[in-house]
């Protein structure tokens, strides 16, 4: 359980050597470079230094990255190759990668341009097709109208098209408009579920009377004068244009399908651009004079030899020192063994420890392991979870946080198997149900300890005992931190007295089984603890009244401890839920009895129920195990707030550069 010791690094080097040096620094991947805001804003430095202006380079590279990303998206839609569940990065020697990029860069950039342009052409044509289909839909009601649409008026007459609700009485409407405008000719062209479509021909001087007469009928005028020919002719013309666009899209898609063969090279170009962009950003974080550049940074103490070797190779001035004890800007890096490291994901989701804090990962790991397994608590589910995670780790070799999470679930599967065997849970009671349904025999896998469904109160006691131990460990960590920081009295008064009180209460209440003496000892411990808390709980407050009220307030905190212990009853709830849900599915699967139909039903229901139960209850176990760490456990000693160490390194998506050879990628 270690927070890695950090060193502060200051470097001054020649501008002429900056580019190759930055390549090598990225290759090492162990130095975090500060933004150097303090230096650039220091009045003493300001006349002589400036920040390298490379925002244009960064913007250009980001535009190139976006373009390559679009190309990958375009050809990805036509890549029929089966994609792995967890894609792995291709491993390449840095020198080989540099040579490869030199040989494929020009061709790959042309392929990117072709993919992007083709993809855009497809998008534009699909937009045009949608527009044309919209026009066709608008013309559909008028396809029986044999009047050219552009001829909406003559010297003396006009054609008014429009629509009214489908419930409109055409005969009555015709009578009304002809009464207002005697010259009107009315034609009901078509109708659909919502509207009727009409064409009105009248003298120009009667247009206002026509529209006024149509107002009570919720008439909506339609203008199609921008169309050429009849509606049928225009629709046919648009359909031809759609066919032409669809043909061009098919040709474009064939181009993209051929470019799939170059996908790997385009991925290489993407990562190359990402590295160039990151190097350009780092240059922007440095400050310079006409001849030299300067930066501050952080590195793990264990990386000092290789960083010093690089700086000496370039003959740069540098200074490496321990950070100021009060400097809160120091980044945090955790280092644990292979068993504990997977559980760093749990710590990281809450907050990293401060630089002076204890890394809680090694302490929470065994409890998380136990709690997760107790909540899922089915031996068969545990074997499935562990086996599945082991296969993923071996076959797909995920990296980073994904690797840690899957490995953690693999360990938690072992815990699930252990608790399941202790409680007798093997796919719930599947084997018992199957034996009785198909063979008429009783078959029960006996628990190695006890059956929680038969003895739920016993499981509740186990849950609360584990919770109390969990809380006591958290309190012990706080006591250790107090002693380490030179506050032994705080450890005694704030933790030791609570140990006395809480343990005393437990002995007083339940110590009868240990003998009458245990009850008496518990009573004395509880009284001493309570009086001690009352007298010392307000020791940091001023005045007798303040100290007394502070002591009473501290003693009232016993209700908080009771609440915290009761929170661990969720171990009981989720532990029972897994078994109950499994038994429900097993019972449903056996309703058809024996025979072929019964066998099929049982297999289908069993398979679905198993997947459902593992998914739902594993998620619940994950969430609630985290909750017990974050709220109950961390609440006793942990504040967090550490800033994660973010080294300047290759952040690639498709390739993994090995730390060998020379890096000459431009």
What does each model-identified segment do?
Residues 1-364, 392, 399-402, 406:
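Long, charged N-terminal accessory/stalk domains
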Residues 2-7, 19-22, 26-33, 305-666:
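Conserved, carboxylate-rich catalytic/transport cores that coordinate ions
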